[in-house]
Amino acid sequence: MPTNQQLIRKARQRLESGTKSPALRGCPQRRGVCTRVYTTTPKKPNSALRKVARVRLTSKFEVTAYIPGIGHNLQEHSVVLVRGGRVKDLPGVRYHIVRGALDAVGVKDRKKGRSSALQSIVATRIIATIPYQLF
């Protein structure tokens, strides 16, 4: 315990809290290439096969990122956008893959979590990606 005189001479150092997503290097998202896509099991009280991918980012980090939603089209060499955000029951998974950006398509037939304005945008985007031979 320092004395008052010691504190006057040299003030207490502020504790700097480290970032929870160091691989993003202060950016909101980073682009990366999937090196491995696989499933893993969560921690003790939960039971499932969670879909995750090992991603090599443009910042030269290789991270494990969670693939949210039901079903995905990702495979090795897919280019994805990675954001921060951990998965509580998967140790070591501190990043999420952004659905609907780059090679990761949005969740098929998603009903919830869409405003009426966004529904029309998503519908036109889906129609725009369908080749003309199908019409």
Curated annotation (Swiss-Prot):
InterPro entries: NA-bd_OB-fold, Ribosomal_uS12, Ribosomal_uS12_bac. The keyword Chloroplast applies. It is found in: Plastid, Chloroplast. The keyword Transmembrane does not apply. One of its GO terms (cellular component) is chloroplast. It holds the Pfam family Ribosom_S12_S23. PROSITE patterns: RIBOSOMAL_S12. One of its GO terms (biological process) is translation. Keywords: Chloroplast, Plastid, Ribonucleoprotein, Ribosomal protein, RNA-binding, rRNA-binding. GO terms for molecular function: rRNA binding; structural constituent of ribosome. SUPFAM superfamilies: Nucleic acid-binding proteins (SSF50249). PANTHER family: 30S RIBOSOMAL PROTEIN S12 FAMILY MEMBER. Part of the 30S ribosomal subunit. Belongs to the universal ribosomal protein uS12 family. With S4 and S5 plays an important role in translational accuracy. Located at the interface of the 30S and 50S subunits. This is Small ribosomal subunit protein uS12c. It comes from Adiantum capillus-veneris (Maidenhair fern). The gene is rps12.
